[in-house]
Amino acid sequence: MSNSDIRSFFGGGNAQKKPKVSPTPTSPKPKRSLKKKRIVLSDDEDGTIENSKVPASKSKVQKRNESEDISHSLPSIVHEDDKLVGSDGVSTTPDEYFEQQSTRSRSKPRIISNKETTTSKDVVHPVKTENFANDLDTTSDSKPVVHQTRATRKPAQPKAEKSTTSKSKSHTTTATTHTSRSSKSKGLPRFSDEVSQALKNVPLIDVDSMGVMAPGTFYERAATTQTPGSKPVPEGNSDCLSGISFVITGILETLTRQEATDLIKQYGGKVTGAPSVRTDFILLGENAGPRKVETIKQHKIPAINEDGLFYLITHLPASGGTGAAAQAAQQKKEQEEKKILETVARMDDSNKKESQPSQIWTSKYAPTSLKDICGNKGVVQKLQKWLQDYHKNRKSNFNKPGPDGLGLYKAVLLSGPPGIGKTTAAHLVAKLEGYDVLELNASDTRSKRLLDEQLFGVTDSQSLAGYFGTKANPVDMAKSRLVLIMDEIDGMSSGDRGGVGQLNMIIKKSMIPIICICNDRAHPKLRPLDRTTFDLRFRRPDANSMRSRIMSIAYREGLKLSPQAVDQLVQGTQSDMRQIINLLSTYKLSCSEMTPQNSQAVIKNSEKHIVMKPWDICSRYLHGGMFHPSSKSTINDKLELYFNDHEFSYLMVQENYLNTTPDRIRQEPPKMSHLKHLELISSAANSFSDSDLVDSMIHGPQQHWSLMPTHALMSCVRPASFVAGSGSRQIRFTNWLGNNSKTNKLYRMLREIQVHMRLKVSANKLDLRQHYIPILYESLPVKLSTGHSDVVPEIIELMDEYYLNREDFDSITELVLPADAGEKLMKTIPTAAKSAFTRKYNSSSHPIAFFGSSDVLPMKGSAQREVPDVEDAIEAEDEMLEEASDSEAANEEDIDLSKDKFISVPKKPKKRTKAKAEASSSSSTSRRSRKKTA
């Protein structure tokens, strides 16, 4: 396929060849090398080319005299396009001019190019226009050209000539800015006649008369915008905004900022973030920021609204006309098409074998070289460098860090979002470096025991192929190297108990390179790998690095794809290359062309559902964007956010709702903002209380799970609508889990104390906590903190009177208020007093109120007997009578008394070792021999 074919394939309306502007035969266009040359015409010879500069051998005085002599006898003639403009302002052709000069004195006229006149210090062009539209009309013949005559000409200065269109002088008018930018494109005007006429008639906005947004009025005025979609979006020519740069600021009338950006990019325009000298138009909405307004006024950038944008789309020609800006954009597009052709040719060379029709695209177009990987080139090169030098670093015992510090690590950790090429890069680099690959991913069970079994004998210097090599098929020892790839290590579940810790131990002892891959680098379970792995972080590639690869795949499959559609696919999938290829393969089954409008529908229908984390859910709720009057988030979208994690989402919102500055108080005066803030917090707290009632019905005896949407509304959506705004602190994890666990623990301690004291007191748990615990705290731990040894018997006597044990003593210390008072008191008790109390308590017997049978636990190895059915019970009655005695004996054996804390079981005597037995036997024989001798 030729270059014209591929332009028609990707560009659509850009396939037509643009006519080139050819100069007239009477005035040939000078070459590029004649920029600073003069054409000198004499009577007897043709035009000769001489340098504009005087040779260095001549003095400054001679140079000035020669220029004055020539200026005395020659009129100034400026070469403008293909005509000669004299000092009287009349434009003639070169032939007509020389016919008029034949009757005059035969002198040597000189022709000064328009390039030289614009850059000369002697020629001055006072350009002062009234508006931006007149400045863009560069093809008008009425533009005055001022020339210097003998009377007004200044003597030539010996200094070097400087351009009058420098940046320091280009701020006077907008026209000078556009003129200086157009001079870079071989003398062509920046915009063609048709484009200039359309830009001249575009309705502009007077920025000087526009007010600056007052503080605290952004969200109030946002509600006055029109209904989205009330104005129809026009359809224009293909790439009609090519070569035009926009900046969007403020709140637009009917379009959101994202919709306006997509619309401009759809027609070939460029959208930047901040206004500058290179900005052509400002798409201005209501309540623009004061800094951007000052920049617009400073650079005098023309501003338009939505009507102006729609006017440009409907009136500009296809491909932006024939101006310099449009040609520059077209050249950039041709370079991208050339790059696509090179990628397609490289893919054809790598895939010489015909692929199967049933092969999926992700496998069919898997990268075969490092050039095929989109983005993260530096990270992939570091991975390849580490794998190349692994065995060299192993010989040095990993003590030489090298320039990047790679020589100190036996393993690397690749982290980054899914679908950006981490696993592909690992396999490709291993293949290029001649390694065999052993991969363990999330589908494999990677517990501590199984890792030991699977990797036993593998983490040495042998290759995996070496285990299967035979004499008939010997293994190439040059490739007898193995690399272990552990994919998705952050996905090790509870079934992979101890897997990360065992992997860390394997890395320390391994003799082969290990590549670990994860998505969430900040996961707590990956902390053991911080000191044993080198961190290589992959980032999401941008659309520029992915465009050529995606379009080359579409070109090979016969799918027409525009660059704007590629940008939307990259943005919608968050640079997930795998998902983009799968979307294209599915779309190709029904259609053969994808437009930007179709790509938006495909992304929305095939949107990948990503389960959000509790931190992200809380941030979305408490951020003010979801509850803005101009937000397009529906109530279903807000409820769906809750169901990403319905167990923690409302707890996170309740933990962080006090740390925001609500948007609703921005409209209030400073004196009333604090009161309004308290009222909003009170409303949010009441909503949380109502959600607790709903939650008790969901998790109560009846379990009304149909109330989950109501709970989402009352616990997340409604409270966040009151306090949503800007947050000044980081999102904190909920403390409810820890507090709830501690509360249950304290309740259990209080219940045990009440059970033990029921023989002496009749108080319930509430009375016991309010009246008895403070007195017992003063009589037991506080008295022990005095350090006197005579108080120990009194403390033990009081404990025995109320049937309190040693664990109850610690519980009383923990139940006291404030929460850390008991812990601080125990630190002040002398060690001698603690030891005396422990010895005294353990050496004496204490009364026990009662204990449950559940305190005596059966042995672990005993199995429970199955209960027979009713039919089997009648038949097995005789057998049960016979086995009754045996079962009773078995139950007695099953009881493990060592588990009972109230029964002290004597310890079994330790077996003597062989050496001690021999020593004792030898000592006994020696004693017997001494007795005999005696």
From Swiss-Prot:
Role description: The elongation of primed DNA templates by DNA polymerase delta and epsilon requires the action of the accessory proteins PCNA and activator 1. Subunit 1 is essential for cell cycle progression. It may associate with components of the DNA replication machinery and serve to enhance the efficiency of DNA replication.
Domain BRCT: 236-326
Biased composition (Polar residues): 89-104
Biased composition (Basic and acidic residues): 118-128
Biased composition (Basic residues): 29-39
Keyword Cell inner membrane appears in the UniProt entry: no
UniProt source species: Schizosaccharomyces pombe (strain 972 / ATCC 24843)
Keyword Cell cycle assigned: yes
UniProt region (Disordered), positions on chain: 1-190, 876-934
Location within or outside the cell: Nucleus, Nucleolus
This protein's GO CC annotations: chromatin; nuclear DNA replication factor C complex; nucleolus; nucleus
Keyword line: ATP-binding, Cell cycle, Cell division, DNA replication, DNA-binding, Nucleotide-binding, Nucleus, Phosphoprotein
Protein's recorded name: Replication factor C subunit 1
Biased amino acid composition, Low complexity: 165-186
Any one GO biological process: mitotic DNA replication leading strand elongation
Record SUPFAM superfamilies: BRCT domain, P-loop containing nucleoside triphosphate hydrolases, post-AAA+ oligomerization domain-like
Pfam families assigned: AAA (PF00004), AAA_lid_RFC1 (PF25361), BRCT (PF00533), RFC1 (PF08519)
Binding, ATP: T362, C374, G416, P417, P418, G419, I420, G421, K422, T423, N519
GO molecular-function terms, A-Z: ATP binding; ATP hydrolysis activity; chromatin binding; DNA binding; DNA clamp loader activity
Residue positions, PTM Phosphoserine: S27
Family to which this protein belongs: Belongs to the activator 1 large subunit family.
